[in-house]
Structures are given as structure tokens and as C-alpha cells.
């Protein structure tokens, strides 16, 4: 009898506990309300009971989100994520909450966390692609869309209509209509469009169609003729008049992307006449030819400084005439190469050899030079808008002088580019490291120069390459190492004018190892320049104003230049 009474009591106790648990555990009721999307009732049910499971946090968080209680929804879903860190539902829904509050950066982080849990989740990939698309980062949007076989593009349109030949523009786009647009197709198309050299600014956009597919819209600022208006043509041609030079330019000849660029400088110390013609080879944007001629008559006074006390190391008048031809090939989106040849003649007059100008540097006569260049993109992080690229050039030359000379110039480049903002180019950061090495005996005009000067691209921005109008005040040499860092802040953007301001830091060293005397041309020590610069764009023409300070000597430099 006692055993029977004990069994009856045990059964009664268990039934009571089950009844109480059924009354207190809201999971079943919450799930039912969730499936029926009865959000107010679900909130009322769960706000008064302890939620000890991730599922309850999920139901409650979504109900709060549907009622637009964003902050509480975020806290609840975060609690559920802590209970179930491997459940992808929580970061996806947290991304939705952040998205509704326009917190795109937070939404992207949550979706990337979800994709680390399940890289094939279609909803998360499409959601993340949509956010990047709304931010204007089409490259990253395609990266995630491509995982789910999207987007399908039906046609390519130019808005507004362009003057370039439609067939040429069509060949510049690597994509095919009625197919999925991929990241590689986008990047290859961008490389080809850039290679046409008639689009200083452009955008490739996607426009949704009613059937769920897309059209590619190409919006571009096109260079055509002397300019898009008389004012622009005048400014392009005479923008350098204060530097005693004019730069007539004619772009997109007959819609063929053939460009004719020229420069005429009448400065008595830096006379120069230059012309270049370039265009797609046989109408193929993957290939581009360039031919040109360059005539120079320059007075040089080689000295140790552009300001203050200075020692003259030598002086001369250089006359140089050259013609050149080259072919450039785009190989996909990341690689391109250039091969060319140059034939030139030089002679020197009014030479003051001083202690620096050796007979090898003053070699005269005809020269032939073979040039090769290779550029390759090493790394690309489109989410961070960060790229690292590299380049190498080789110039092998032979001079028919008495005696004859030959040389080889090698240069390498490593460049980093970062756009820290999700949109636009505000606070753009650039860093370039370049190095050069010379083998053999080079003539004077083949030496490298570290300094800011209109005919030189190896800038130390507190070392001006001219003094009293004559070149020769910047360090010269056969071997160099140069680092240029700068950042730009957008300060003004109007209809015809844009202004950027920012600091810079240049570090470099240059030396000449050919002889003891020629070593006086180099810097001997490391150079450190810092300062600020303003970059103006006026009717498509670039103007750069520079203030630089030489941290080694304390010299201040002010410089202005006009470019394309």
C-alpha cells in the first residue's frame, strides 16, 4: 500500500510540474504569434517574462523591429547573438535594424559576420550587395551579387550621348548584353575606358528594369576637340601663359579617341616644342599607339641650392631633338605593358665644366633608346577602397659619341591609394615609393633629378629645380630612392572649379656613382620635405600651388604649375 501511495504521489507531482511549465514557458505561444505576424501581441507576451533562449530573443527582437523600436530591437537581438553566436539569423536581422537607421557601416559589419557563418546565404549576399550599391561602390556590390548569379544586364546606354564612335565605345566595354555582369568585366571595362584618354571623369551605373534585370548606364565627361566651350578651349590652350607656354590640345579626332597634344614654350632659358599623337591601334581599345617629337633648347646652371648661398658646379646650354614611338597593351584589368623606341640627338654649347660636368656627361651625338614599361596591380580591397600597384621601367640606350657610350636605366614603383570614406574621394590618401638605378655611362640629360620642375616627375616639393629661370638647382644623379605621401581634403566644388587642400611629406636621396667629381651633383644625404598644397581644377585644367619646407636646411619653397 505504501508503494502504491508513493507512485500516485509521484505521478501527481510530475503532472503538476508539467502543467506549471506549460503555463510559464511562452516558446510555443511566441512561435505561433511570430508565424502569424501578430507583433503587438508577441511583444506583450514576451516583455513580461524572462527570455532564457536565443529563439525567444529572436522572436522578440523581430517583433520590436517591425514596430520600429530600433534600439530595443538591437539590444534584444544582440543578446540572442551572445546566446547563439553560430546562428546567422541574428547578424542578418541586426543588419536590418542598422539599415533602417541609416547606419550602413554597422549593417555591413553584421552582414559580413553572417557571411562568415554561411558564405552562400543568398539573402545576406543580396542585402550586402544592395548596401554597397546604394553607396555607389558598384565593384563590391558585384562581388556579392555574383555569388547568387546576379545582376543580369540587358544593354549599355550612354547618358548623355557621346561623340566617340559607338563601335569603339562598345569594344571598350568587356561585358556582353543579356548576361551576368562580373567584377572582372567591370574592372576591365574601366581600364579600357581610362586607356582611351578622353574621359577624365566617368561613372558606370546600374539602372533597374521592371523585369528585375538591369541596364548599364555610362555617364562621362568627354574631352572632344579643343574643349566643350570656347572658354574651356581658351583656358586649356593659354592656361600656362604666365609660364611663357601655350598647350594646344585636340581630343577625340572624328570620334576616334585620337588625341593631339602639343606644347610651345618661349622662355629664353627653357625653350621647348613638343607634339604627341595617340589613339587606339586599329580601333581596338586594348591597344594604343603614341608617336611624338620633342625639341629642347635649355640653359642650365648646375648649383647646390635654389635659394640663399649656392655654389655653381657647372653650366651649359643643352640642345636636344628627339622622335619617339610606342605601343601600349592592356592585358585584363590588372596588367598593362608598353614598348617603345626613341631616336635623339644632343649637343652642348657654352659649357662651363666646373667640378661636376665630366666628359662622359657631355657626350654628344645621336642616340637610340629602347623603352619598356610594365604595370601590375598587386592587391585590391574594394570594401576598404584600398589598392596597391607596382610598376617597372627599363630604358636601354646607345650613344654614337666619341667614344661611344651605352647605358641602362631601371626604375621601380610601389604605389598605395586609399579612399577612406564610403563615398566620394574626400581625404584621399596616396603614397608612392620609387627607385632608380643606372648602369653604364649616361649623358647629362639622362640623369635623374629630385625636385619640383615642370619637365620632371620626381618631385621633392621643397627643392625647386630652377633658379633665376635656369634649370640645375635640384639634386641630380644616377641612382635615387624617393617616397611621396600626400592626402587631399575636398574644400570646394562648384560648376567649373574644384579645390583640394592637404599636407605632403617627401623623403628622398640621390647620388651619382660614376666618378668622384660627378658625385657632387647628388644630395649626399637624405632629404626631408614637408608642407601643404592646393589642387585646383578649373574647366578641366589642373593647377597646383605648393608651399614646401626643407627640414634639413630650413629653406622655404613656393611653386605653381599647370597640368592636364
Per-range role (PLM):
Residues 189-389, 452-468, 473-483, 542-564:
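Gram-negative/organellar outer-membrane beta-barrel architecture
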Residues 54-55, 88-89, 122-123:
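Helix-start (N-cap) detector for alpha-helical repeat units in TPR-like alpha-solenoids
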Residues 35-36, 66-67, 100-101, 134:
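Register position in tetratricopeptide repeats
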Residues 22-55, 59:
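N-terminal leader/linker segments that initiate helical-solenoid repeat arrays
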Residues 367-499, 503-504, 511-513, 558-562:
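C-terminal outer-membrane beta-barrel translocator/porin domains of Gram-negative envelope proteins
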Residues 78-81, 96-100, 104-239, 246-250, ...:
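Periplasmic polypeptide-binding modules associated with outer-membrane biogenesis and secretion
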Amino acid at each position: 500500500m505504501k508503494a502504491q501511495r508513493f507512485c500516485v504521489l509521484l505521478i501527481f507531482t510530475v503532472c503538476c510540474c508539467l502543467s506549471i511549465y506549460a503555463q510559464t514557458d511562452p516558446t510555443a505561444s511566441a512561435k505561433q504569434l511570430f508565424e502569424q505576424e501578430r507583433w503587438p501581441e508577441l511583444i506583450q507576451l514576451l516583455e513580461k517574462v524572462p527570455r532564457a533562449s536565443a529563439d525567444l530573443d529572436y522572436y522578440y527582437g523581430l517583433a520590436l523591429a517591425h514596430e520600429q523600436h530600433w534600439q530595443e530591437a538591437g539590444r534584444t537581438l544582440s543578446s540572442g547573438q551572445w546566446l547563439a553566436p553560430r546562428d546567422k539569423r541574428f547578424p542578418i536581422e541586426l543588419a536590418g535594424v542598422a539599415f533602417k537607421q541609416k547606419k550602413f557601416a554597422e549593417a555591413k559589419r553584421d552582414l559580413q559576420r553572417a557571411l562568415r557563418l554561411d558564405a552562400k546565404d543568398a539573402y545576406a549576399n543580396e542585402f550586402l550587395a544592395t548596401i554597397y550599391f546604394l553607396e555607389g561602390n558598384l565593384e563590391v556590390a558585384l562581388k556579392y551579387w555574383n555569388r547568387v548569379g546576379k545582376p543580369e544586364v540587358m544593354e549599355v546606354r550612354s547618358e548623355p550621348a557621346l561623340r566617340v564612335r559607338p563601335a569603339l565605345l562598345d569594344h571598350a566595354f568587356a561585358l556582353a548584353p543579356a548576361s551576368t555582369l562580373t567584377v572582372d568585366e567591370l574592372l576591365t571595362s574601366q581600364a579600357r575606358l581610362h586607356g582611351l584618354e578622353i574621359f577624365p571623369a566617368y561613372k558606370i551605373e546600374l539602372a533597374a528594369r521592371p523585369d528585375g534585370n538591369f541596364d548599364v548606364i555610362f555617364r562621362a565627361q568627354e574631352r572632344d576637340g579643343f574643349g566643350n566651350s570656347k572658354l574651356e578651349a581658351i583656358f586649356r590652350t593659354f592656361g600656362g601663359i604666365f609660364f611663357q607656354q601655350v598647350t594646344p590640345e585636340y581630343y577625340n579626332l572624328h570620334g576616334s579617341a585620337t588625341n593631339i597634344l602639343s606644347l610651345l614654350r618661349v622662355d629664353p632659358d627653357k625653350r621647348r616644342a613638343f607634339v604627341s599623337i595617340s589613339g587606339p591601334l586599329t580601333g581596338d581599345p586594348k591597344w594604343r599607339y603614341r608617336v611624338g617629337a620633342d625639341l629642347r633648347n635649355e640653359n642650365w646652371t648646375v648649383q647646390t641650392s635654389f635659394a640663399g648661398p649656392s655654389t655653381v658646379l657647372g653650366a651649359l646650354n643643352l640642345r636636344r631633338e628627339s622622335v619617339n614611338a610606342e605601343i601600349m597593351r592592356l592585358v585584363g584589368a590588372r596588367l598593362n605593358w608598353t614598348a617603345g623606341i626613341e631616336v635623339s640627338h644632343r649637343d652642348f654649347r657654352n659649357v662651363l665644366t666646373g667640378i661636376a660636368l665630366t666628359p662622359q656627361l657631355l657626350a654628344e651625338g645621336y642616340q637610340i633608346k629602347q623603352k619598356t614599361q610594365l604595370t601590375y596591380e598587386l592587391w585590391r580591397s574594394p570594401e576598404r577602397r584600398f589598392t596597391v600597384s607596382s610598376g617597372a621601367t627599363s630604358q636601354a640606350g646607345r650613344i654614337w659619341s666619341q667614344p661611344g657610350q651605352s647605358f641602362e636605366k631601371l626604375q621601380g614603383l610601389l604605389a598605395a591609394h586609399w579612399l577612406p570614406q564610403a563615398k566620394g574621394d574626400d581625404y584621399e590618401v596616396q603614397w608612392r615609393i620609387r627607385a632608380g638605378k643606372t648602369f653604364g655611362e649616361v649623358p647629362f640629360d639622362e640623369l635623374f633629378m629630385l625636385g619640383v620642375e615642370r619637365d620632371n616627375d620626381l618631385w621633392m616639393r621643397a627643392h625647386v629645380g630652377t633658379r633665376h629661370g635656369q634649370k640645375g638647382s635640384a639634386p641630380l644623379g644616377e641612382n635615387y630612392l624617393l617616397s611621396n605621401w600626400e592626402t587631399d581634403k575636398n574644400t570646394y566644388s562648384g560648376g567649373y572649379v574644384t579645390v583640394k587642400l592637404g599636407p605632403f611629406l617627401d623623403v628622398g636621396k640621390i647620388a651619382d656613382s660614376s666618378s668622384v667629381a660627378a658625385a657632387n651633383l647628388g644630395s649626399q644625404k637624405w632629404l626631408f620635405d614637408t608642407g601643404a598644397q592646393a589642387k585646383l581644377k578649373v574647366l578641366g585644367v589642373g593647377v597646383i600651388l605648393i608651399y614646401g619646407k626643407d627640414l634639413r636646411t630650413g629653406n622655404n619653397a613656393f611653386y605653381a604649375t599647370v597640368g592636364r
